[in-house]
Swiss-Prot record:
Similarity comment: family membership: Belongs to the RuvB family.
Enzyme Commission numbers on file: 3.6.4.-
Known role: The RuvA-RuvB-RuvC complex processes Holliday junction (HJ) DNA during genetic recombination and DNA repair, while the RuvA-RuvB complex plays an important role in the rescue of blocked DNA replication forks via replication fork reversal (RFR). Catalyzes branch migration on Holliday junction (HJ) DNA in complex with RuvA from S.typhimurim and ATP. RuvA specifically binds to HJ cruciform DNA, conferring on it an open structure. The RuvB hexamer acts as an ATP-dependent pump, pulling dsDNA into and through the RuvAB complex.
Chain positions covered by the region annotation Large ATPase domain (RuvB-L): 1-181
Ranges for region Head domain (RuvB-H): 255-333
Lineage: Bacteria, Bacillati, Bacillota, Bacilli, Lactobacillales
Residues annotated as binding Mg(2+): T66
SUPFAM superfamilies: P-loop containing nucleoside triphosphate hydrolases (SSF52540), Winged helix' DNA-binding domain (SSF46785)
Activity control mechanisms: Binding of domain III of RuvA to a single subunit of the RuvB hexamer activates the ATPase 2 subunits away and nucleotide exchange in the adjacent subunit.
The species this protein was found in: Streptococcus thermophilus (strain ATCC BAA-250 / LMG 18311)
Location of the region described as Small ATPAse domain (RuvB-S) in the Swiss-Prot/TrEMBL record: 182-252
InterPro entries, A to Z: AAA+_ATPase (IPR003593), AAA_lid_4 (IPR041445), DNA_helicase_Holl-junc_RuvB (IPR004605), P-loop_NTPase (IPR027417), RuvB-like_N (IPR008824), RuvB_C (IPR008823), WH-like_DNA-bd_sf (IPR036388), WH_DNA-bd_sf (IPR036390)
Protein name per the record: Holliday junction branch migration complex subunit RuvB
Amino acid sequence: MARILDNDLLGDEEYVERTLRPQYFKEYIGQDKVKDQLKIFIEAAKLRDEALDHTLLFGPPGLGKTTMAFVIANEMGVNLKQTSGPAIEKAGDLVAILNDLEPGDILFIDEIHRMPMAVEEVLYSAMEDYYIDIMIGAGETSRSVHLDLPPFTLVGATTRAGMLSNPLRARFGINGHMEYYELPDLTEIVERTSEIFEMTITPEAALELARRSRGTPRIANRLLKRVRDYAQIMGDGVIDDKIADQALTMLDVDHEGLDYVDQKILRTMIEMYGGGPVGLGTLSVNIAEERETVEDMYEPYLIQKGFIMRTRTGRVATAKAYEHMGYDYTRDN
C-alpha cells in the first residue's frame, strides 16, 4: 500500500501535475535561488542566440524538477523532448533521440543517474562538442560513422546527484539545487491548486495543510485532494482548519508532517536502542523497510526537521524526537 506522504508519483498524479504545471517563471512558486540564476543564464543565452548551457537539477522527489525543465524550455522558446534514464537501455536508443533534435532543443532526462554507463559515455562528446561517433555493422565490416549534432541543451534531473559519474557531472555548466519549500510558498501552492480545481479553502486550512506536507508540493497537492474528499462527505464541501485537521488526522499525518512510518522509525530508535546511535541497516531491518527506502524517503525529512542526527557511529534521535513522541528526554538518552 502506497504512503500518502510518498514523494514519488502515485496513480494518476502525472496527469494532475501536468494540469497544475506552471508555464513560466512568473507562475512558478518557490525555488527563488534557482529561478533567479536561471533567469540570468537564459536571458544571456537568448541575447547571444545560443543554446543554454547543460543544466543539472537535483534534490528530493516532488520538488518540481520536471516542471522547472518545462519552464526553462518555455522561457527559451524552444521544444523539449523528454525521456528518463531507465528508458534509455542501449546506446542506440540515445543516438536515435539525439539525432532527432533540432537546433536549440532541450533534451530532458529524468533520473539521469540511472542511465547505463555505455549510454552515458555517448553523452560526453554530444554534450561537449555536439557530435557522436557510432559503430555501424559488426566484425570486420564494422565502421565508425561521425554524426554532427545541432547545439542543444541537456537538462538532467536526479534525486541522487552523488551517483553521477565525475565526467558526466563536469559537463553540466549550470547546477540547480532544488530544496524543500518554505511554509509561505507551500501555502501559496495549496491556494493556487484549490483555485484551479475550484475548491473552497480558508487561509487557515491552507496553512495547516502546507505545514503537514513535508515541504513538498507533490505531497501538498495529494493531501489537498484527500481533504477535499473528506470535506465533501463529512462537511459542506468547504475546507476549513477544523475539517483539514480531522482529515489529516484520519490519514495519520501529524502536525509535523510525520506519518506512521516516520513515527515507527523514531519509536524504534528510542525504545529499542535508547535513542541511538543505531546503524541504518539495523534500523531498516527492525521496521521492515529496505535500507535505500529509509535513506532516500524517510531520513532526509526527519533530519531536516531535527528529529534525527547522523553521526559517525549511526543515527541518533534528538531531544525534539523524544518530545514529539511523548518520551522523557535526559542527557543520558
